[in-house]
């Protein structure tokens, strides 16, 4: 069935005159090629997205069509956009561990939510273990959400051991597909 629909779409794109087309002419393309911009007005990264929205590859012009009778054919017009792969995007932020920690600032990440993510196409955080030096009289690091107190303390040289301790932490570093 999918092959038949694909053949009908290709036939419509290759048709020379309006009499050869099996459906009404409308633009069909991924959402970033269409010219409706009301859905990106609230997007804080609209200026990045704007370039994609106004991009129209050479040769698409009037040749690109949308199936107007989607109910008749059993094909949803937005199915074209669903075929684009949904990738995981990572947003980074600096985390201040406070005075008495070295390094004081770490870069952590979280997954940027996207409309195409669902239970079949979801993302998860990838964690790396890092070791942080913290002063012994400060115990704020043990309350940290990234702290990994399940492991024993890593030994330090004698000169540092009385004032500092080396604590392992699991830091989120990237957003990756959950199935993989």
Swiss-Prot record:
One of its GO terms (molecular function) is prothoracicotrophic hormone activity. Residues 16-64 form a propeptide. Residues 1-15 form the signal peptide. Its main location: secreted. Disulfide bonds join 88-123, 111-175. The keyword Ribonucleoprotein does not apply. GO terms for cellular component: extracellular region. It comes from the Eukaryota. PTTH is a brain secretory polypeptide of insects which stimulates the prothoracic glands to produce and release ecdysone, the steroid essential to insect development. Homodimer; disulfide-linked. The keyword Flavoprotein does not apply. Keywords: Cleavage on pair of basic residues, Disulfide bond, Hormone, Neuropeptide, Secreted, Signal. GO terms for biological process: neuropeptide signaling pathway. Gene3D superfamilies: Cystine-knot cytokines. It comes from Camponotus floridanus. It is found in: Secreted. This is Prothoracicotropic hormone.
């Amino acid at each position: 069935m999918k092959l038949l629909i694909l053949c009908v779409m290709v036939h419509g794109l290759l048709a020379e005159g309006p009499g050869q087309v099996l459906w009404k002419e409308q633009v069909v393309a991924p959402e970033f090629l269409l010219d409706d911009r009301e859905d990106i007005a609230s997007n804080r990264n609209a200026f990045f997205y704007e370039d994609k929205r106004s991009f129209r590859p050479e040769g698409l012009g009037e040749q690109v069509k949308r199936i107007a009778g989607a109910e008749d054919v059993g094909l949803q017009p937005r199915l074209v956009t669903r075929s684009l792969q949904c990738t995981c995007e990572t947003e980074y932020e600096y985390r201040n561990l406070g005075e008495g920690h070295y390094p004081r600032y770490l870069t952590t990440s979280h997954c940027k939510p996207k409309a195409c993510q669902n239970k079949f196409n979801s993302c998860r955080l990838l964690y790396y273990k890092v070791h942080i030096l913290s002063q012994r009289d400060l115990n704020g690091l043990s309350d940290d959400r990234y702290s990994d107190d399940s492991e024993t303390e890593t030994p330090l040289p004698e000169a540092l051991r009385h004032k500092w301790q080396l604590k392992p932490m699991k830091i989120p570093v990237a957003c990756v597909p959950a199935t993989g």
